Amino acid sequence: MAPAMRPAAFLVAALCCAATAHASPIPSDAASVGRYFSYDNAAADATVDLIGQAQRRVLLAGYAYVPPAVAAALRAARSRGVDVRVVLVRSSRAGKYSGAGFLKSAGIDVAIDSRHGDPAPRFVIVDDSVALTTLSDDAAAHAETVNVFQRAPELAQSYAQSFWRLYRQAGGL
């Protein structure tokens, strides 16, 4: 597959993983889509910015580890009274740091799914917005793409259903 097609192929695969995402149009004229690609921190910054906008909930799933900036944003959201829950995927590639202890010490509910290996769809739901993250095949480059769908409540609901399924499978609830 051509490198330019990989992000689009992942997006299609990720949308199919959500129970009804393929049938959920972005309903609002106010909805927007942003795409961030980088070899530096621009993609992570987009995720941090989205979490910073949270008012009610943040659900994060599919990460083998939580990047420190994202973990700090999750803790800040929790301290503002936002309901924050995380499902991490156990991975031998995560190394010693996963962020789980850091998040748990802030009172964030963290479930670890040891049944699934890499790759897993990585997504963050913030109120009625969704961010989908893909990593480059070149692990050494640490490149990632983040697609952010803002003000997309039906898409967020579809991914929330997937989150709660993953959460239950990981032993949460």
Question: Each predicted region: which residue ranges?
Answer:
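Sec/Tat signal peptide C-region and signal peptidase I cleavage site
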Residues: 20-22
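Bacterial N-terminal signal peptides
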Residues: 8-18
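Primarily the HKD phosphodiesterase
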Residues: 47-108
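Signature of lipid phosphatidyltransferase scaffolds
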Residues: 24-26, 125-126, 130-173
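Positively charged n-region of N-terminal signal peptides that target proteins for export
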Residues: 1-7
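General small-molecule cofactor/ligand-binding pocket signal
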Residues: 36, 87, 109-113
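Solvent-exposed loop/turn segments at secondary-structure junctions
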Residues: 64-68, 90-94, 116-119, 130-131, ...
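Short N-terminal segments immediately surrounding and downstream of signal-peptide cleavage
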Residues: 24-46
